[in-house]
Amino acid sequence: MQAQYLEAILSSNPTERAAIYATLSSEERSYIVRLLDSYINNPYLIYEDDPVGFIEKGIGESLWTKQKEIVNSVRDNKRTAVPACHAPGKSHIAARIIAWWIAVHPIGTAQVVTTATTFRQVKNILWPHIRKLVKKTNLGGEVSQVEWKIDGELVAFGFSPADTDETAVQGIHAPHLLVVVDEAGGLSQTLGVALESLMTGGHTRLLLLGNPPTDNEDSWFERACNSDLYNVIPIGAYDTPNFTGESAGICRTCPASVAEHSVGTHLVDETWVR
């Protein structure tokens, strides 16, 4: 709702803006003033309900169809599962979703928790994407190996508890809570159920990313992908731009010293599926 108010005012000309103000009560005008003050401090507020806009307009990157499905699903659904092939950019898009979640909520009200099968995966797969994204944008704060802090506030962190340590997730809560499970195929049933218990109240979201099971059948991730509780978005190699012919846009994440190239360079291609 805040985003809609802001967008209507910011996109209007002075005459239209005056007409809008004329229809408002003094209390509503005060509310608009507070929103505009907030916008000055955080221009990303207009993307509260528009994660695609945040990524494409706010930070200037391209998205292809399946990526848009994922980010909109996190906006609209409490639980999203993405069983995907190798190298479709799962961790890349997860980092953008995390950035959107933190950027559009007031500091201190939102938190992101990430986990994976091992701490090595937490540290080396998803968090480098988060670190690079924060560094190249004006999202603010400092990102260490597995923590993102803004003005001293811990807004996101990664961890990997023991398979049977369901108590490790106790006490995790925030008005706006996003939990991201990378390499979800290896997560234990005990931890999976514990993470799902965090979805019981408030504005909470759970995003699972992983490869379809091969030798680890009947895993918690596989059950989630077969559950009506989840919005499931499968991504096969032939769903990605190098096979569909869809434009993936120009890569904006590599250093400026790297020659301009398509995002498709980083995605699964024919050499992977031969």
Where in this protein do the model-derived segments appear?
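Phosphate/NTP-binding elements of NTP-utilizing enzymes
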Residues: 1-274
